[in-house]
């Protein structure tokens, strides 16, 4: 209960002490701090390392080896007799090898690693898009909650003035006690509605705050967007076919699928590389030192110099038969390629369904907005006329409250329809490759 009260105080404090957050700021913050996105970024970095490893496979390797050995005991001498002796030897070698031809395996692995990095980058962008849409949805709910609360406050203000007016009229004997009681009940209901809308608004802001993973001590409130009703009504909805065509060229999930399809083609080429011979160039530098007890031999430095040796060679490996492993690897790579083709078609189908649903939702939202706009204008005019009749004693308090409630309900319905339509239009622009904003 204490936390609820504190939260209410934070949200109800004047905006001068609040940090005002726009939708763009919320999205940027979420993208920067979301844990899942940061994990996805780590995966992209791993793909970058894999690409570096694939590129470095064409470089020569270099290794250094050293060996020191000792032996003790009886051994055969040069005059064919046995005697106790000890020997020790030292060997040093520097060797290198470089691939000259591997059936284009290295080149195709580089292409595949680059494709996997590009696919991971697009998948990261898709994850960012998901966050953008989620933040926009919660932000819009918070905006709607703000506007609904303002409408409820207006209702409380109207009912408060009307209640006070009737009380004064009752004292003057110009109003019935029953009318005052009904108006006081209407005021109590208006205050209850305001309490509920404030609770819903706080809940929406809290949900947005939790999505952004904001720290508890960070002040937070949203900036209310401003929209012209005529401009909103004049917005044109593009065709579903146009939206889908644009989405096919812009959406990261489509780009990622196409890149993965290309990567699977490289995988077939990598498997086929095992059919070709492999040629390596190798080279080495080495020297050694040897000493036997009882025999006079050159010193360490002289032996190391005199025993210095160099070597160069070519290594050719020609595959003949490996128990059909290469054949099966090629077949498996082709099956994976076919699976990726099906996955690509499924991704396109899912995108088509999404676009159709967004288009239908937008058309419906526009129809609701247009109808709500007419209903709002009509209810405002009806309230104006009823209010004039009531003030002239030609309408009852019940008729006045009914007209007032109809007007305020139409305003609430218009707010909901307006923001739903704005959100759906923003989604259409987003599917067409534009920034998500409203």
Language model region names:
Residues 4-14:
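Sec-dependent N-terminal signal peptides
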Residues 18-63, 67, 73, 216, ...:
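Bacterial Sec-pathway N-terminal export signals of envelope proteins
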Residues 20-138, 279, 283, 324-327, ...:
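Short flexible linkers and secondary-structure junctions
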Residues 38-42, 55-56, 86, 100-128, ...:
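Sec/SRP-type N-terminal targeting helices
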Residues 93-95, 139, 244, 313-315, ...:
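Membrane-embedded beta-strand positions in outer-membrane beta-barrel channels/transporters
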């Amino acid at each position: 209960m204490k936390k609820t009260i504190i939260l209410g105080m934070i949200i109800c404090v004047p905006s001068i002490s609040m940090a005002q957050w726009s939708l763009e700021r919320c999205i940027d913050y979420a993208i920067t701090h979301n844990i899942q996105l940061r994990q996805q970024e780590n995966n992209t970095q791993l793909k970058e390392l894999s690409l570096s490893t694939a590129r470095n496979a064409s470089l020569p390797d270099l290794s250094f080896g050293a060996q020191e050995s000792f032996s003790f005991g009886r051994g055969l001498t040069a005059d064919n007799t046995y005697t106790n002796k000890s020997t020790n030897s030292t060997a040093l070698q520097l060797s290198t090898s470089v691939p000259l031809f591997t059936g284009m395996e290295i080149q195709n692995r580089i292409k595949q690693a680059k494709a996997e990095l590009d696919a991971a980058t697009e998948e990261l962008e898709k994850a960012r898009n998901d966050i953008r849409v989620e933040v926009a949805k919660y932000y819009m709910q918070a905006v709607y909650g703000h506007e609904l609360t303002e409408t409820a406050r207006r209702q409380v203000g109207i009912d408060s003035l009307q209640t006070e007016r009737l009380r004064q009229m009752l004292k003057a004997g110009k109003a019935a006690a029953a009318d005052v009681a009904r108006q006081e009940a209407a005021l109590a209901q208006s205050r209850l509605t305001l309490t509920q809308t404030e609770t819903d608004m706080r809940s929406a802001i809290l949900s947005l705050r939790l999505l952004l993973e904001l720290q508890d001590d960070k002040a937070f409130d949203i900036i209310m967007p401003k929209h012209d009703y005529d401009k909103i009504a004049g917005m044109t909805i593009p065709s579903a076919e146009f939206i889908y065509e644009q989405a096919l060229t812009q959406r990261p999930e489509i780009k990622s699928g196409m890149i993965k399809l290309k990567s699977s083609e490289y995988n077939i080429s990598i498997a086929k590389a095992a059919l070709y011979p492999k040629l390596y160039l190798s080279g080495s530098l080495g020297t050694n030192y040897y000493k036997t007890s009882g025999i006079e031999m050159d010193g360490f430095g002289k032996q190391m110099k005199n025993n210095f040796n160099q070597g160069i060679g070519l290594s050719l490996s020609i595959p003949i038969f490996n128990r059909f492993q290469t054949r099966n690897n090629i077949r498996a790579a082709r099956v994976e390629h076919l699976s990726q083709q099906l996955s690509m078609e499924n991704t396109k189908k899912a995108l088509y369904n999404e676009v159709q649903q967004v288009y239908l939702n937008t058309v419906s939202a526009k129809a609701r907005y247009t109808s709500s706009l007419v209903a709002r204008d009509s209810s405002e005019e009806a309230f104006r006329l009823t209010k004039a009749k009531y003030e002239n004693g030609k309408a009852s308090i019940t008729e006045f409250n009914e007209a007032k409630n109809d007007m305020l309900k139409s305003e609430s319905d218009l707010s909901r329809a307006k923001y739903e339509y704005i959100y759906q239009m923003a989604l259409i622009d987003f599917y067409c490759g534009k920034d998500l904003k409203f």
